[in-house]
């Protein structure tokens, strides 16, 4: 019986509620599937079969360890080189250089040694903005600030100072007002094919409350517009080109989620591209779990 290990983390050793049914779906297809904690020292990854990243939510605080682990796994999806690229949001600059419309981002680096005054002068002068670390997941350590309110600006500076002092790169983006009215749209691709779209309501409502803060996601099924599909396909092609430049084999990624918001002109713009362990929210689309399970089995058959 072929073996599939669904990589997760210690906080959710049996996978999250969206991914847990994948074990049964794969079993129905004759696959020995089981959740495995990625940093469990007792696991022999050479005997783990095909390893599929699913609920490895703690990688942001231990990215170097996570990337080293990914590179040590003989059969990993998505591939380790792509994971390394995707776990640092500087990847947005790679996409921008390839002509993909991405949110404009200002990067603050620890080695710049920026003072509080210098941070103050670099932050936007008006509107709202979002501040977060370049290596993060699940909106952890992410805050929404108002540029022309003194207390909000002070908290933003405090937030940036903390992250930079921890040796973490910081990204600053204008908060897109459309998120409050239209939300975000996530387009999910499985094995290179667009499968379904999701709507996520706004979830940032103020300054960061610290690294342990959690945000409640409100997800619904939606339909992708033709313009959104066009942008998402540009992203997919760009990521494929980057994948080949990283010396990974040709062919589509097993999964990807492309998160879009509207810019001030109403044009879909990339906020994030998730190809490491994105939440795919199978329960919101009939058949989505089966499509994903079939795609995994096809990778087994093709190996």
Language-model region placement:
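Phosphate-binding site of ATP-dependent enzymes
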Residues: 150-244, 261, 269
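Active-site nucleotide/adenylate-binding loops and adjacent lid/helix of ATP-dependent enzymes
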Residues: 2-8, 71-73, 81-182, 226-229, ...
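Short, solvent-exposed loop/turn segments at secondary-structure boundaries
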Residues: 17, 144-145, 283-286
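Short, low-complexity, intrinsically disordered N-terminal peptides in bacterial proteins
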Residues: 1-3, 302-303
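Short, solvent-exposed loop/turn segments at secondary-structure junctions
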Residues: 11, 57-58, 136-137, 177-178, ...
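ATP-dependent carboxylate activation and anion-phosphoryl transfer catalytic cores
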Residues: 193, 207-208, 227-303
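Conserved N-proximal alpha/beta basic substrate-recognition cap immediately N-terminal to
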Residues: 9-114
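Anionic group-transfer/hydrolysis microenvironments
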Residues: 56, 134, 175-176, 188, ...
């Amino acid at each position: 019986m072929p073996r599939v290990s669904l990589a997760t983390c210690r906080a959710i050793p049996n996978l999250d509620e969206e991914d847990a049914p994948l074990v049964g779906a794969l079993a129905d297809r004759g696959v020995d599937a089981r959740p495995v904690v990625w940093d469990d020292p007792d696991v022999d990854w050479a005997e783990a079969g095909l390893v599929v990243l699913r609920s490895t939510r703690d990688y942001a605080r231990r990215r170097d360890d996570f990337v080293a682990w990914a590179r040590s796994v003989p059969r990993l999806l998505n591939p380790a080189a792509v994971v390394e690229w995707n776990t640092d949001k500087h990847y947005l600059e790679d996409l921008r250089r390839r002509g993909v419309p991405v949110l404009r981002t200002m990067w603050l680096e620890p080695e710049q040694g920026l003072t509080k005054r210098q941070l103050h002068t670099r932050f936007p002068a008006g509107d709202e903005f979002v501040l977060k670390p370049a290596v993060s997941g699940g909106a952890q350590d992410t805050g929404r600030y108002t540029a022309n309110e003194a207390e909000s600006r002070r908290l933003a500076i405090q937030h940036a100072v903390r992250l930079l002092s921890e040796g973490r790169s910081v990204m600053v983006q204008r908060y897109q007002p459309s998120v409050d009215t239209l939300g975000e749209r996530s387009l999910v691709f499985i094995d290179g094919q667009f499968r379904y779209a999701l709507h996520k309501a706004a979830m940032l409502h103020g300054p960061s409350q610290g690294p342990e803060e959690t945000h409640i996601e409100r997800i619904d099924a939606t339909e992708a517009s033709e313009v959104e599909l066009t942008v998402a396909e540009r992203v997919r092609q760009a990521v494929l080109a980057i994948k080949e430049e990283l010396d990974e084999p040709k062919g589509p990624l097993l999964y990807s989620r492309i998160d879009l918001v509207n810019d001030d002109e109403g044009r879909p713009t990339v906020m994030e591209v998730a190809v490491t362990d994105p939440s795919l929210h199978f329960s919101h689309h009939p058949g989505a779990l089966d499509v994903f399970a079939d795609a995994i089995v096809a990778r087994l058959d093709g190996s």
